[in-house]
Amino acid sequence: RSLVGSEMCIRDRSEVSKKFQPVGVLHSPYPISWADEERDVTAWIGNELQNEAFDKLYRLRDKIRAIDHPDFTYVWNFLQGSDHFYYMATKWFSDGDVHSYFNPYDSPYEAFINYMNVLSDFEIEVDKKYGEAIRAVPA
């Protein structure tokens, strides 16, 4: 079908927000998700694997900001991708099937090990660059 000649069109959210006024306020005191029966963030930070990976990643935040280098920022942003954490989900029953779709890993533990290895290598490079940045600051 074609939208030509119809009243339908495709707009991005910034265009919609300029064209229309809100009709009400949605109160959502907790995160809402499309994923799993709980519809919360447990698909990404709901087990020890995910929490350990998340915590290790965010311990690098201040160094990444201090380095202020586009290559490091790019990798930092990539490592924050939700898919990495989603692949580490250990949920069972109907939710477990969803987590196996499009997942390149055989298990959440394999996803965790791979992610932590990549993160450890990145941390080594961050520490080197951070050390260079600290030494370059005039006393």
Indicate residue ranges for each PLM-predicted region.
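Hard-cation-handling environments
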Residues: 14
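Active-site cores of enzymes that catalyze phosphoryl transfer or operate on phosphate-rich substrates
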Residues: 17-69
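Histidine-centered catalytic/metal-binding microenvironments
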Residues: 56-139
